[in-house]
Curated annotation (Swiss-Prot):
Assembly, per entry: Homodimer.
Record's keyword terms, sorted: Hydrolase, Magnesium, Manganese, Metal-binding, NAD, Zinc
GO molecular function, one term: NAD+ diphosphatase activity
Naturally occurring in which organism (per UniProt): Shigella dysenteriae serotype 1 (strain Sd197)
The protein's required cofactors: Mg(2+); Mn(2+); Zn(2+)
Short motif (Nudix box): ranges: 159-180
Classification via InterPro entries: NAD-cap_RNA_hydrolase_NudC, NudC-like_C, NUDIX_hydrolase-like_dom_sf, NUDIX_hydrolase_CS, NUDIX_hydrolase_dom, RNA_Hydrolase_NudC, Znr_NADH_PPase
The name this protein goes by in its record: NAD-capped RNA hydrolase NudC
Length: 257
């Protein structure tokens, strides 16, 4: 339940608008509300981090509005809470009116939801399930440079799950569409909320089965097999992609060293 922030309120401050995050001095604000001119703002507590409250304030600031990607090097728990705040702020902003009857909506006091004041329809934040998979062939891992990542970073393959599709089917389809190969021995590893914009990454490892690499140029700039001890530039630590790569490297080391 939201409330008006007072002078002595303190904690972590997620100030967000239109999927942007307020980052004074490039950092997520922490401390007393008065230090950040937040007294009098309406805020919603969205969690706790190390015993301190994490507050969401839906507001556009004139300066220092950036991407949640800029705080990806925070502790994972705090980064995920910042991502939750950005996603909730966008959810509340985009659900002011009911999509069925057009009447004004209001936030639920008991859950992350918006309620219609007229037809009683209930809306929840949209979450887009995605798969991400590390594919191993002997002592090598398949890594690709995506068209949206023109910074030299190579990563594993990923994509959105389609309507009526299982996670396993999504892995097989995405891998075939993007790289032209087939995989086998699919194993679930972990999951990670990913606020770009509202994804839930489900991570897998798999073994190469058959086929030659034929990339989809709309998705990839290039893809290739890289030996575990001679890898290109990788995603930053803390991402599920980096974990999958490191787990695959560990398997290769155990077998080939």
């Amino acid at each position: 339940m939201d409330r008006i922030i007072e002078k002595l309120d303190h904690g972590w401050w997620v100030v967000s608008h239109e999927q942007k995050l307020w980052l004074p001095k490039g950092e997520l604000p922490y401390g007393e509300a008065a230090n950040f001119d937040l007294v009098g703002q309406r805020a919603l507590q969205i969690g706790e981090w190390q015993g301190e409250p994490v507050w969401l304030i839906q507001q556009q600031r004139r300066h220092d509005m950036g991407s949640v990607r800029q705080v990806i090097d925070l502790d994972v728990g705090l980064f995920l809470l910042a991502g939750r705040g950005v996603q909730l702020a966008e959810f509340y902003r985009s659900h002011k009116y009911c999509g069925y009857c057009g009447h004004e909506m209001y936030p639920s006091k008991t859950e992350w939801a918006m309620l219609c004041s007229h037809c009683r329809e209930r809306y929840y934040p949209q979450i887009a399930p995605c798969i991400i998979v590390a594919i191993r062939r002997d002592d090598s891992i398949l890594l690709a440079q995506h068209t949206r990542h023109r910074n030299g970073v190579h990563t594993v393959l990923a994509g959105f799950v389609e309507v009526g599709e299982t996670l396993e089917q999504a892995v097989a389809r995405e891998v075939m569409e993007e790289s032209g190969i087939k995989v086998k021995n699919l194993r679930y590893v972990t999951s990670q909320p990913w606020p770009f914009p509202q994804s839930l990454m489900t991570a897998f490892m798999a073994d190469y089965d058959s086929g030659d690499i034929v990339i989809d140029p709309k998705e990839l700039l290039e893809a290739n097999w890289y030996r575990y001890d001679n890898l290109p530039l990788l995603p930053v630590p803390g991402t599920v992609a980096r974990r999958l790569i490191e787990d695959t490297v560990a398997l290769c080391r155990a077998e080939y060293e």
